């Protein structure tokens, strides 16, 4: 089975086994300021203690799933010759689960791969305002200063270090101790360099060093010693300058050097070879670099990102240790070492980095895609505002590496992508894609992985080239890709051939059948919307698929060969050679997006299973294949205008037969806190609540599992002590008259919110008395999970796999839906106008082939890009299948209401439609009264804040255009932020009096105050042009 998340797993494994020790080795030994004490970290004996809990328990307890790191540490005292050794705890490192996720504080997170410029050397040609060409070479390090060579229009050489002022390159080379005789042998053309030498050279190295220092630190006294120190610190100190193994590999490759990969600093050979290449470039003997080519961009996967964080943490730890290391009698390694700087750096990364993301868990495809995502954003990457078109654009080198289709719409377009289906990442972080080698026109059986720079040197044939059983290419002339251009060549000159027509697209995109007949924009929407499909109660496989669904599996796999001994809803027991193993199945667990994670067994008692076999599948799967939607009978026709603008008309069958019903799990939580007036209590004794409302609570006041709850139902009964000031006036009166004490508690129970109903499936009680970890001031925490069944309704969003999305506008009774000549009513009516302008004709092929498959009682798998077989292969194949099923592409339909024929034949088909996570239940919102913003006194915005509908600029313009002056004034004052007017209006409505006129809006007062704060005297003038301080009095 193809491992689609190997990128994540391999990277993290390298981090734990190799990179972690490397970082500790870099700081060991730590020597104090006197040189008397040395702290040695013995990384060879580092131990990682496995976690005591499982990932499921970590989620349940809201803790981090991590490994403890221990290492022996020796403290050497050179004064006494004493060596003390102790095993030291270095903190916790989050451990990746089997599914390549991390559990941080109970939440499942994913670390996204970052695509960055590779360290190395880059050559560019620039055009100035006079259209004269100049050249530059940039040495980019993984960590440390950049060096930029510049060759101007006078053919003089300059160098710029980081963003400092430029200086003559000759001075820089002389400061490094090089003279003309040492430089000349490294250059193939010496005239350009000699001109610069004559113009800029100084007498000796010392003078060059002083000149260098003056340029780098103008205004500071320049000495040879300080210049040497600066030069060393900038480019030759491994702690401050690091090319990394990748940078060294790229430099060697570009400049044809053979310096060992362990050398991570710049050498004079690098600098002189770079200079020689720049001069060759100026003479048109070399090529400039394309910075968007994937040879020059690499992936930083989870392991490398974590390694960088560990480096930051260890540098902080090293600084802290140096300050603590003072000679003392009882000094022990344990008293010196505090792992906090290291653990806080790692925690900081997982909690706040742009690349550590809350996992998209709507369905198995969304999870998989999230783990294979590539982002150009994040620390050390690009920002949305700075990224231009070139970075976002599709590049020829993306073929087989990064999907050209799957990317978000909007500001992140092109900055966030997805790995192609067969792509893998090599040890340097460069993406490779597989090819079949071709020798003398014969395709070999073996597979070779090539990086983007290697690929450019070969002639590559596409996957749809025909070849016979022996592998011999049939056509004498073949279209090939060579140096990123398409050309033709003799079959015997082909070097490699792509392995599949779908190798250039991502996991989500390769699930779209007839992809080649869709416009790219719609294919993009189709890819993205499949990730938003909600798992349904009854999953069913598509009639028309691409055959890739079996790779997108999610579930439980057998760890070894064996025989199934028992199968239950919650576990499967398999007898392996080493003994029985119980596999726990997740039942009705809440995902990050509130969808339901529910595993169903796929095996029966007595079945022989093999290692790696799927024994239980998740909710959005059917027979071990991904099943995100349902096959429904669709018709492309207008229906009374209800499917105007992409809306759908659907049949009641989809509601009553639970075709598009999904289960969502909502979590409600309440805490019993310690307040100043006493502790809150969780109890059944709630003041002023009848017995009927308490009927489902147990003796402790907590809802029973299995109870059906509606809006307003009490989930957890809770009372809070209240003070004297909280007493209502009638309470105070009673006390004043009778001296009685009425109840000193108020009802603060957890209730079901408006618009929600469902069944309680889990109740979890966390108590400080039972040793559970709770925040300060919390004694008891109760969590209630409610499963909500959501049937499809008007306002829900549906979509096909081709970007054909829409909202359900009307649900018709079955008897009113148009029906086929055999009496079968249609399930969904789509607008035919949604096809031509959108150019996603793939949906028609899918619908018609699906209808034929349904009639023939079979499922059809068709790989995209089937034109390799012959011209118009898709159309011919669909017609063949329709003919075999004795069906026509268009059918006479009858109106369900009148029984009459429709005037024209209608395209009817069986399409695979998805219900998306944008459910109307979570969007519908209304406000009568609610919270207001403190400063402007305008209603808050958004459903979460119970906000109002904003009347924006354009709406104001529309009302102005209609001259609706009174309506406009009401909207800007009484209904918004005129505080006095609001209260007066409420009283007027209650007392059935005329609505008062609007006063001054609060936001206008804020504007006045801001202008006054600037020292401007603002007054309001009446038409009689006499100044009235009306505004002033109101403000006062």
Swiss-Prot record:
Its top-level enzyme class, in one word, is transferase
One Gene Ontology cellular component: chloroplast
Pfam families membership: RNA_pol_Rpb2_1, RNA_pol_Rpb2_2, RNA_pol_Rpb2_3, RNA_pol_Rpb2_45, RNA_pol_Rpb2_6, RNA_pol_Rpb2_7
Q: Where does this protein reside within or beyond the cell? A: Plastid, Chloroplast
Question: Is the keyword NADP in the record?
Answer: no
Alphabetized InterPro entries for the sequence: DNA-dir_RNA_pol_bsu_ext_1_sf, DNA-dir_RNA_pol_bsu_external_1, DNA-dir_RNA_pol_su2, DNA-dir_RNAP_su2_dom, DNA-dir_RNAP_su2_hyb_sf, RNA_pol_bsu_bac, RNA_pol_bsu_CS, RNA_pol_bsu_protrusion
Q: What is its main location?
A: plastid
EC number annotated for this UniProt entry: 2.7.7.6
Q: Which family does it belong to?
A: Belongs to the RNA polymerase beta chain family.
* Protein's name according to its UniProt entry: DNA-directed RNA polymerase subunit beta
Q: What is the lineage of its organism?
A: Eukaryota, Rhodophyta, Bangiophyceae, Cyanidiales, Cyanidiaceae
């Amino acid at each position: 089975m193809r491992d689609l998340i190997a990128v994540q797993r391999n990277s993290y494994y390298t981090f734990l086994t190799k990179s972690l020790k490397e970082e500790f080795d870099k700081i060991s030994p730590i020597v104090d300021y006197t040189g008397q004490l040395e702290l040695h970290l013995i990384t060879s004996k580092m131990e990682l203690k496995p976690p005591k809990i499982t990932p499921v328990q970590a989620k349940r307890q809201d803790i981090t799933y991590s490994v403890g790191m221990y290492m022996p540490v020796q403290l050497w005292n050179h004064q006494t010759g004493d060596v003390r050794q102790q095993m030291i705890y270095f903190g916790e490192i989050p451990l990746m689960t089997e599914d390549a996720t991390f559990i941080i504080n109970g939440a499942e997170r994913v670390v996204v791969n970052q695509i960055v410029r590779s360290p190395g050397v880059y050559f560019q040609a620039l055009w100035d305002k006079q259209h004269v060409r100049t050249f530059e070479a940039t040495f980019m390090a993984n960590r440390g200063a950049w060096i930029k060579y510049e060759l101007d229009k006078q053919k003089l050489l300059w160098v710029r270090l980081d963003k400092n002022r430029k200086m003559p390159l000759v001075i820089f080379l002389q400061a490094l101790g090089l003279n003309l005789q040492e430089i000349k042998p490294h250059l193939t053309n010496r005239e350009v360099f000699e001109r610069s030498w004559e113009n800029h050279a100084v007498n000796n190295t010392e003078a060059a060093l002083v000149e260098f220092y003056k340029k780098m630190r103008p205004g500071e006294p320049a000495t040879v010693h300080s210049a040497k120190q600066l030069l060393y610190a900038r480019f030759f100190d491994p702690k401050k300058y690091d090319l990394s193994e990748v940078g060294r590999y790229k430099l060697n490759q570009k400049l044809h050097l053979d310096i060992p990969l362990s050398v991570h600093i710049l050498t004079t050979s690098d600098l002189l070879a770079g200079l020689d290449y720049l001069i060759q470039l100026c003479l048109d003997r070399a090529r400039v670099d394309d910075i968007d080519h994937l040879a020059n961009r690499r992936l930083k996967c989870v392991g490398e990102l974590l390694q960088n964080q560990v480096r930051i943490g260890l540098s902080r730890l090293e600084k802290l240790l140096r300050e603590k290391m003072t000679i003392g009698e009882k000094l022990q390694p344990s008293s010196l070492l505090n792992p906090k700087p290291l653990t806080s750096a790692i925690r900081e990364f997982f909690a706040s980095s742009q690349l550590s993301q809350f996992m998209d868990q709507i369905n198995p495809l969304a999870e998989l895609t999230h783990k294979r995502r590539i982002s150009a954003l994040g620390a050390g990457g690009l920002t949305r505002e700075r990224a231009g078109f070139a970075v976002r654009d599709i590049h020829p080198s993306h073929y087989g590496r990064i999907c050209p289709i799957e990317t978000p719409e909007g500001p992140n377009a092109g900055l966030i992508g997805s790995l192609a289906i067969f792509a893998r990442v090599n040890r340097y972080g460069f993406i490779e894609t597989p090819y079949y080698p071709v020798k003398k026109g014969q395709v070999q059986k073996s597979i070779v992985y090539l990086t983007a720079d290697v690929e450019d040197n070969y002639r590559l044939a596409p996957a749809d080239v025909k070849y016979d059983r022996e592998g011999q290419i049939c056509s004498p002339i073949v279209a090939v890709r060579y140096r990123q251009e398409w050309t033709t060549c003799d079959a015997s000159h082909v070097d490699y051939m792509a392995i599949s027509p779908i190798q250039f697209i991502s996991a989500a995109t390769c699930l779209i059948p007839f992809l080649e007949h869709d416009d790219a924009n719609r294919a993009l929407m189709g890819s993205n919307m499949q990730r938003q499909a909600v798992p349904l109660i009854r999953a069913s496989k598509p009639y028309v698929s691409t055959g890739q669904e079996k790779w997108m599996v999610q579930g439980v796999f057998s760890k070894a060969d064996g025989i199934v001994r028992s199968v239950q809803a919650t576990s499967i027991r398999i007898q392996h050679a080493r003994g029985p193993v119980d596999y726990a199945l997740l039942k009705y667990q809440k995902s990050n997006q509130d969808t339901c994670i529910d595993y169903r067994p796929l095996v029966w008692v007595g079945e022989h299973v093999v290692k790696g076999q799927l024994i239980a599948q998740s909710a959005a799967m059917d027979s071990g294949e991904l099943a995100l939607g349902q096959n429904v009978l669709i018709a492309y026709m207008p229906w009374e205008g209800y499917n105007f603008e992409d809306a759908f008309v659907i049949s009641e069958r989809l509601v009553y037969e639970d075709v598009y019903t999904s289960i969502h799990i909502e979590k409600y939580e309440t805490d019993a806190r310690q307040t100043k007036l006493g502790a809150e209590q969780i109890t059944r004794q709630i003041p002023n609540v009848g017995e009927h409302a308490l009927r489902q609570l147990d003796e402790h006041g907590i809802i029973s599992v299995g109870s059906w709850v509606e809006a307003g139902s009490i989930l957890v009964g809770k009372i809070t002590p209240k003070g004297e000031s909280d007493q209502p006036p009638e309470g105070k009166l009673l006390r004043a008259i009778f001296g009685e004490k009425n109840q000193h508690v108020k009802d603060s129970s957890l209730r079901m919110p408006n618009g929600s109903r469902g069944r309680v499936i889990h109740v979890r009680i966390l108590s400080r008395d039972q040793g559970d970890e709770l925040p300060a001031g919390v004694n008891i925490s109760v969590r209630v999970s409610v499963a909500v069944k959501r049937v499809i309704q008007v306002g829900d969003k549906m979509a096909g796999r081709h970007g054909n999305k829409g909202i359900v506008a009307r649900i018709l009774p079955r008897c009113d839906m148009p029906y086929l000549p055999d009496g079968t009513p249609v399930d969904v009516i789509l607008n035919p106008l949604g096809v031509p302008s959108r150019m996603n004709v793939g949906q028609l092929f899918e619908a018609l082939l699906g209808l034929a498959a349904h009639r023939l009682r079979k499922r059809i798998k068709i790989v995209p890009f089937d034109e390799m077989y012959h011209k118009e292969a898709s159309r011919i194949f669909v017609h063949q299948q329709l003919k075999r099923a004795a069906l026509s592409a268009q059918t006479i339909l009858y109106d369900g209401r009148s029984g009459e024929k429709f005037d024209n034949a209608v395209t009817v088909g069986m399409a695979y439609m998805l219900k998306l996570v944008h459910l109307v239940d979570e969007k519908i919102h209304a406000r009568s009264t609610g919270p207001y913003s403190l400063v402007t006194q305008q209603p808050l915005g958004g459903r979460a804040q119970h906000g109002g509908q904003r009347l924006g600029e354009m709406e104001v313009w529309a009302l102005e255009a209609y001259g609706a002056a009174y309506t406009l004034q009401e909207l800007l004052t009484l209904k918004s932020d005129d505080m006095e007017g609001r209260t007066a209006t409420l009283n007027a409505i209650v007392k059935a009096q005329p609505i008062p006129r609007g006063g001054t809006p609060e936001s206008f007062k804020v504007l006045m105050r801001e202008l006054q704060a600037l020292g401007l005297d603002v007054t309001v003038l009446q038409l009689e042009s006499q100044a009235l301080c009306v505004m002033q009095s109101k403000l006062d």
